[in-house]
Amino acid sequence: MSVMVVRKKVTRKWEKLPGRNTFCCDGRVMMARQKGIFYLTLFLILGTCTLFFAFECRYLAVQLSPAIPVFAAMLFLFSMATLLRTSFSDPGVIPRALPDEAAFIEMEIEATNGAVPQGQRPPPRIKNFQINNQIVKLKYCYTCKIFRPPRASHCSICDNCVERFDHHCPWVGNCVGKRNYRYFYLFILSLSLLTIYVFAFNIVYVALKSLKIGFLETLKETPGTVLEVLICFFTLWSVVGLTGFHTFLVALNQTTNEDIKGSWTGKNRVQNPYSHGNIVKNCCEVLCGPLPPSVLDRRGILPLEESGSRPPSTQETSSSLLPQSPAPTEHLNSNEMPEDSSTPEEMPPPEPPEPPQEAAEAEK
């Protein structure tokens, strides 16, 4: 007897996650919805490096050293790896509260603040938390229905609370937070070195060619080199400046969001409770500390009730799994009767027994 197995589509948690993120590769890749500038970043890096490897590297490897394209390839691969790691990873999104958790938090807030008279503004929903003998305020997020952890903030573009939120970077197409900040820093650092490297050797290439055929003839014969020089010149200042700014933040163990708001350098002159007072310790904590795991569980499987589908009943399941074919027959002995008799059309009724001979003679 053949049995047909019916498989239903599994609903994973990333398909039902709130927010404005997009997912690819069955939830393994997580990005923001606005990815146009990210594609521009890829185009500029890939286009500039392709021209550099196709023209300048071939000439410089023969005239100067074959190590020039090797080192350029190492910088290029490292920059691309850190860019994709920053763009495709979870920056540290904090899950929103479930309905039961949100109701419990609301009851806790009402019990703490008391009843608010009608017409008056309710007090701010803030909890005080002490870190290194410093009072830190935990703010309530009305979208996620949670009290945000220290240094967390709600991104208005991705519509999620991100742990140790630094900023939303459209150039990488993702938020920069606790789980991908180190990769973001390594990306802009390696990109700065790559830009300086390509720009410098383009100048060397033009100088060497100008010694043979002249400066104007070199510019006419190598329009790709001119394009590379222009791209590197205009992007060099912004990338190198951004790297220097984030190096300053890493040394202080501070985020871009805290620097913009003036959390530790404002009028109140409150000391940064997260700084160790040592540049080396701060750099080790930000860039070399253990990477926390993602708390989203994007590829987890949702129950049928939460995925929006109705669980099949027992009768539906049995009828869908069993084949619609007649039951197998068994071989019976001549003196055995089957438990389930056939229909009247298939089995004729038995003939009445003949009366015995003695009863017939008595009647006569």
UniProtKB/Swiss-Prot annotation:
Ranges annotated as biased composition (Polar residues): 310-323
Effect recorded for residue 169 to S: Abolishes palmitoyltransferase activity
E.C. number: 2.3.1.225
UniProt record, GO biological process: MAPK cascade; peptidyl-L-cysteine S-palmitoylation; positive regulation by host of viral process; positive regulation of cGAS/STING signaling pathway; positive regulation of pyroptotic inflammatory response; protein palmitoylation; protein targeting to membrane
Enzyme type, top EC level: transferase
Gene Ontology molecular function: any one: protein-cysteine S-palmitoyltransferase activity
Organism superkingdom: Eukaryota
UniProt similarity note: Belongs to the DHHC palmitoyltransferase family. ERF2/ZDHHC9 subfamily.
Name listed for the protein in its UniProt record: Palmitoyltransferase ZDHHC9
Organism field: Homo sapiens (Human)
